[in-house]
Amino acid sequence: MTREKSIQATVDYFTSGEFTQTLARRVAYRTESQNADSGPVLLSYLTDEMIPALQALGFDYLIVENPVGGKGPFLLARRMEPEAALTLLTYGHGDVVRGYDDQWREGLSPWELVQDGNRWYGRGTADNKGQHTINLAALEQVLKARNGHLGYNVKIILEMGEEDGSPGLNEVCAQYRDWLSADLFIASDGPRISAARPTLFLGSRGVFNFELRVEAREGAHHSGNWGGLLSNPGIRLAHALAGMVDARGRILVPGLRPPAISATMRHILADIELGGGATDPAIDPGWGEPGLTAAEKLYGWNTLDVLAFVTGNPHKPAHAIPPRANAHCHMRYVVGSDAANFGRHIRRHLDDNGFADVEMVNAVSHYAATRLDPNDLWVEWGKESITRTSGVSAAVLPNFGGGLPNACFSETLGLPTLWVPHSYPACSQHAPNEHILADTTLEALKIMTGLLWDLAEQGADIVRQRSQLQKSQSAETV
């Protein structure tokens, strides 16, 4: 069978309704990892749903208990061929955020796949059940087309805690490094830059969360009796934040800013257009770092945002000076940032500017920033394959704007990482009415079928060329 016939077989599979049935069954699992009572259903998704599907494709498997107590389990699976020229590792997560059942529009439920025209609604359709279902369906079609022989091994890690911060994932990758060893990582999560343009991203921005707090005194005091005599925690905290990021969103603390954007990065991002969709918010052109394009701000720069700010009782304000104020903040940061010292930079800045009373707590980096070299041979291979299938020039992003546990694969396992997202920016991911688009889903199935077919045809050559290039570069440094 040819590449084209394999892709057509995938189209036939989609139109038969089998894909829809599989996804509907998976959406029905209430796999809310942020719900402490979800342990049994998290395990059931793996044992009752995913393991039978993978066994049918010739995989053997391990269920791995999370090294972090009380958190979701992992499924490690592999399909090995005796004379395989390379090994592919892929990933997905079967957990979802909370359903927020009562907030969905009339006629919808987070635990039921509902088709409404081009939109298919259900929790996990976009993040991530729909995406790993697409990839496994494409793998099944390529296996059938090639009579069960790919010429490469396939390994899979499915976690059930990504929406809870991926607890234990890095530890499992380290413990099972040999079991998970591979030549290439391809997975899917997050949105394309737009529904109409297939996307390939090479890593993700990191996430650094922290809370700033002012505890001035016990209890509130009447503003008529004490106003002008007692410091106001809300005002103190507002001014502390204003010294860290200006009124237009520009980061003012030098240690929190990234390195200058390289010429290579600017070239890659030059053709990336953001926003403009029917449901996209209007971009504020004057917000963020001056002199950067929208794409450079999102994919090549750091941001500092206030997520929540509370002082007093906003719902029942009183004529009293509040005793405390706190702000939950976070940063999205790119490779090259001094993330290990973000906390120290913030503390020093506050102290140097007279804000010793502002306490920083719960400072933690959930995801590290990662980025595959855009000149890596796998990048051009992936872009060409996606473009060939879709007929649209694939957008290549140096990193995803959001956070992903990519460091587990790129750093702990040492793999080149390619992410091919299948949702789109307005998919209501993490919100009520989450959905995917049927036409984008079909295109994604075709893209992944082509990609996995091309890996069988060209993967061994890429592995060989990369090895030769690395040897040459090593010799030059000696």
Regions found by a protein language model. Give the residues of each.
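N-terminal helical capping/dimerization or prosegment-like subdomains
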Residues: 2-101, 324-326
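An extended, acidic, His-containing surface patch that forms the Zn2+-binding/catalytic region
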Residues: 83-85, 194-195, 251-316, 320-324, ...
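Active-site metal-coordination/substrate-binding segment of hydrolases
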Residues: 85-155, 178, 443
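A common structural junction motif
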Residues: 94-95, 244-248, 347-356
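Histidine/acidic-residue-rich, glycine-tolerant segments that coordinate divalent metal ions
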Residues: 151-232
